[in-house]
Amino acid sequence: MKNKSLVLKILENDKGGKIVLSTLAVVVFVVSFCNLFVPVDSVFHISTFTVTILGKYLAFALLALALDLVWGYLGVLSLGHGAFFALGGYGLAMYLMRQIGDRGVYGNPDLPDFMVFMNLKELPWFWYGFDNPLFAFFMIMAIPAILAFIFGWFAFKSRVTGVYLSIITQALTYALMLAFFRNDMGFGGNNGLTDFKDILGFDLQADTTRVGLLIVTFLFLTLGYLICR
């Protein structure tokens, strides 16, 4: 077979990868089908809660894949990967909060509910632009990448390695956690960002949206795995 697809070429000598990705593809298909097309009163129906949990597992698998790339292939034990993962998550959450508009508890079209509760009069400057999905999705990738570059530059330039680098990465995560937990930081404090309504115009409570997000997460996980290979 001379005209093999790029995916098949990458996985040609990766039997384990083919088995895992194929199994996940079957699981995602079966779960999606049983959620959308099997009657709710059927024993074969899979709940939307299960769909959501599976989507979270796949998202965490993507995080584990990133950690494996840094630790398993480069030999750098990072205990702070959760920090970069969280920054991307907060970026998406900020976009989702901006989509709520006047549908919040306080009905303020410009400020999220927690900002109204905190008696803020205007939107913090770092929230601007997150009502635009293209800007938001760009920042979701750019902000963690910039932080990782700056942190890595100073760490490796200072020749910090081994367990000392691991401790520093853990300290970075803890410092960011303390910062985000502060109510005056503008990120919802220890309650976080909640009460999302929709994403790109699709109702987040709809079964079809949850299944769509599950499939997209699986595709990104597959893409991430292929890039790592």
For each feature predicted by the language model, list its residue ranges:
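Transmembrane alpha-helices and adjacent helix-loop boundaries
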Residues: 1-229
